[in-house]
Amino acid sequence: MAKSRKVVIPYAPRAAFAEFHDRSERWACIVAHRRAGKTVAAINQLIRAALRCERPQPRLAYVAPYTSQAKDLAWGYLKQYTAPIPGVRANVSELRVDLPNGGRVRLYGADNYNRLRGIYLDGVVLDEYADMDPRAWSEVIRPALADRAGWATFIGTPKGRNGFWEIYEKAKVSPDWFALRLKASQTGLVPAAELDAMRGELSVDEYAREMETSFDAAVAGAYYA
């Protein structure tokens, strides 16, 4: 039998995300202000799950609204935090990292969500879900979790009362869901002086939405309902 090897990932969770990492619920929803660190937390959750999964050939996915956005938001973090793992292989053309236990973490864009048809998933993070077509979840991603009883985490900043709001409302009252809401005025992650400056530069609705995670702030332009 091969000996297990201790691997230390260079990630120190922010206190605001400690309960997220310690949760036991299968489903999770995080509504967080800008620059809270939600993508870093989510990527490390995927890495840990891929390393600890007891099923053969674990498959984990990170989904952003667009493939280019997934690369910009998460690829650097995925490479950074998996770099210390012996035998890890990064494939930039496919935006995936292969781990020595057979696990794989891959980045996708919801703009081409049918690319996920036919695959299985042990876990998935949907980042900035408010900007996604909800059919990506209901028609493709949710069925991909079924046979392996995979988990899902929805994260993002509000954009009105759309599909992300519906997910959060469900998460708040369902026993099999974990819900977390992080407002900049409460977390202390953004310096107070910076928040004061932003209040003078952003509109009232923009600040309420981006920093105070308000679902009721007005949103310019169209979004999926």
Where on the chain are the PLM-derived regions?
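Conserved P-loop
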Residues: 25-94, 182
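ASCE P-loop NTPase helicase motor core
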Residues: 131-202
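Pre-P-loop entry segment of helicase/translocase ATPase cores
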Residues: 1-27
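Residue-level preference for the first positions of well-ordered beta-strands
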Residues: 27-29, 59-61, 105, 123, ...
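Short, solvent-exposed loop/turn segments at secondary-structure junctions
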Residues: 35-36, 67-69, 159-161, 187, ...
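Inter-Walker segment of RecA-like/P-loop motor cores
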Residues: 67-122, 215
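Walker B catalytic acidic pair
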Residues: 127-129
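ATPase catalytic-site recognition across NTP-hydrolyzing enzymes
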Residues: 187-225
